[in-house]
Amino acid sequence: MNMNLPDVTSKQLTTASLPLKWVGMEGIALPITLAEQPSSSLSAKANVFVSLDKADAKGIHMSRLYLRLKESLTNEPLTMGALTALLQTLVSSQEGLSLAARLQLDFELTIRKPALLSGQFGYQTYPVSIRCEYINEKMNTELSLSIPYSSTCPCSAALSRQAMSDAIATQFSEESVSKEALLTWISSQQGSVATPHSQRSFAYLKLQLQHNELPDFSALIKNFEDVIGTPVQTAVKREDEQAFAKLNAENLMFCEDAARRLKQALENNEKISDYWFKVEHQESLHAHNAVVIDHKFPQGYDKL
């Protein structure tokens, strides 16, 4: 039906014979399915590119990228095999114009999370990004995650304890103190002498995986949350909120503490070949953030 329609890309040559690194599309809406949640469809946005290596070609066959993307990822769960086959197909679809392809998939993963004590549960979403490059017949993959957590300042906690100690000394000046009177005072509003500052904090991670294998995303996120120790909550009742307060007291953290916990977990994970991360504590005491940035190798992170 299209045989008589003009094809400018195939028939016309460019006036400037120069190759171009990447040509493609961004923000393509696409439903995808993860192997760990095969019955659920996720809404993703895809960025897809190929190299334009034929210097005198007018442009790439862009519609072929869209069609190959749609055909490949909407019909089967997302696996490394499926991604590799797709990028190879993207290159071959250009019929000699391209030697390399790249793909980025951005989506939010929804995870069911139980409350700490009450038996309630809720849902939390986590931004996930998968970047793939197929260059020189080699596939490289990068995974990006954003994980929120709670952090309470150790210095502020110590100052709060000192303030409480001073207040008790002032309130109960006698040598001996009635246990009942002390507990009554602590439980009253007067007993709220000082509270340490805490804040919502974030770990941003970029990971390159051994053998380019896609992980179980939910399990990987939970592992990092367990390592840090203070994951944010969803549905809570009073007993959950109290348990969360205790959890924060047991895990007082400067940004350096959180970063070291995360780094140790990354170093111990044999499936991760390279990493970059940023820990960000969005301070409630200050108008600025406390930040740590680190990567695996001294020469830096080889990002895609």
Question: Which role fits each region the language model picked out?
Answer:
Residues 1-304:
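N-terminal intrinsically disordered, cationic/polar leader segments
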